[in-house]
Amino acid sequence: MTSADQLLHAELPPRPAVLTALNDEIQSEEPDLNRVSDLVSGDVGLAAAVIKTVNSPYFGLSRQVASVRQAVTFLGLAEVFGVVTGACLRRSFVSNDPMMEQIWDESAARGASMRRLASELHVLAPDRAYTCGLFENAGMALLLVHAPGYAHTASQAGDGMALMERERVRYGVDHPTLGQALMRTWGLPEELALAVRQHHGLAQLDDAEMPLLARQLVALSTMANAALSDERADWESNRALIAHIVEAAEEQLQRLFDELATLDPMRN
């Protein structure tokens, strides 16, 4: 059996070099857009993944982009960094199990949906919402690669809370904890890592001791996950609280929810 210590330390992939280089450039006094574009375009597979993601319906661009440079121009540095982070995350875990593709497809749809909600509601930076959505199930990808029998364990669970309990019993750690640890390893903001850790913890939504940004991210996650699935009980029972946390009217949230529910996450 894979130990919790192994999963939390030895099995966490290091931050990709391209992310470190991108972050250094973006945080410089005068970021060079051409340098940013060149860093991403230097990896053909990464560039293709970025362009494909940016052209998805969730990003709502008025026209398709054909290059990384165009993506940088239309979205800005912060959002492109988020998209590159997502592409690197997907490449960090490789498995022939069909569950892996499902994890990443759902993560891409969730991240883009949370980004869209953040953008429409003007409640927090869209790139942060996007990144948080991508990492929510990153711990599942790690378990699928390194934990024996994980696909079967996951298939036997019902909702997210039941899955977490099964993970803790069998592997000594759950996927939100692993996702949080990975975000910290990659140097991502602590509020985002906390939101990933708590994304199944709806009881934390009205916890004043939890940072507001983290609660807002959990709220958007709850909304996005419900719109992308048939499991809508959490959204429906917490709609008023979610509206309060993101400072929006329930009618506006319902309209956005309905729009998300009609989008095909795999359409490009």
PLM feature segments, named:
Residues 1-151, 161-232, 265:
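Conserved alpha-helical "signature site"
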Residues 1-4, 237-268:
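Terminal helices and disordered tails flanking the catalytic cores of nucleotide-processing hydrolases
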Residues 154:
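Helical (often loop-to-helix) elements that flank the catalytic cores of nucleotide-handling enzymes
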